Amino acid sequence: NQIGQSNRYDFEKILTQKSQKDIDWFFKTIIDSRDIIDYKFSDVSRTTDSITFSVKNKTGIYAPIPIYGIKKKEVVFKEWIEPKTKDSTYTFSRKNADKIVINYDNEVPEYNQRNNWRSLKHVALNRPIKFNFAKDLEDPDYNQILYLPTVNYNYYDGITPGVRFSNKTILDKPFNFDVNPAYSIKAGTLSGSSAFSWNQYYRNSTLYNVRYSISQNYFHYAPDATYLRLNPMVQFRIREKDFRDNRKQMFLFRQVIVNREASDYITDNSSPNYSIFNARYSNTKTELID
């Protein structure tokens, strides 16, 4: 800057000249595009001395990525690989590792770190389950389940203590569940609610998110009868072509289905069950007000 104002191209030129490897991928992928990097393991096999595995490129964007061998949270080896095809196979010395991890220290800005682990001891469960109280930050080392004690009340169920289990953390996931089993003290039966949702994201489209969900509630509406309410729903979220524009549109379609048991306390049981269709549209824009 003593001679003139430097820019990114000066920085790129210096790095390119000093690097012993081709680093065009860094500027083309990380700097100049919205492309995302996402690798995962497939076809892992191991012996006492070696590990053979394939690395699957989920987005088709190629970049060097480090592979770590971990034993009891200690790094026993680290190897950089440069996948050139959609599925590349490698063999490394095991060095007593009990798991292998892609991008363990997050050195490469990868889109999804939840699929980076592969256990060499437990085939069915790559990441151990960890229970955390209430809301917590994302920890890609574990399959996190959040729990929270709950207490609700209605006249026919009385006090209904329960425990809420969820996998929803701050970062979005494709699949979310929220289950709240409870016990109705007055009725002496189980009750509660649950919700499950699946998200599809479209990175380069104005239709950027489709969300499918279903929720249910099960409680008493009379001393001798329960009701079950089901709520299947689909949402379409749309943004502007200019991604910096905060205007968002949403189309929501849902069906509310209620099934009620017949009750001796209700004089008119001619149509205890019903179903209602609901559609909704919103168009919002969030901006700071001067």
Q: How should these model regions be labeled?
A:
Residues 1-48, 53:
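Amphipathic alpha-helical substructures
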Residues 23-24, 37-104:
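Beta-strand-rich binding/interaction modules
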Residues 149, 177-181, 212-216, 232, ...:
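Membrane-embedded beta-strand positions of outer-membrane beta-barrel proteins
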Residues 203-218, 234:
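A glycine-rich helix N-cap at a beta->alpha junction
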Residues 16, 224, 250-257, 261, ...:
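Large, well-folded core regions of big proteins
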Residues 18, 56-59, 153:
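Non-cytosolic beta-sheet module surface loops
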Residues 156, 170, 184-186, 201, ...:
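Structural signature of outer-membrane beta-barrel domains
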Residues 81, 92, 103-206, 244-247, ...:
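Outer-membrane beta-barrel initiation region
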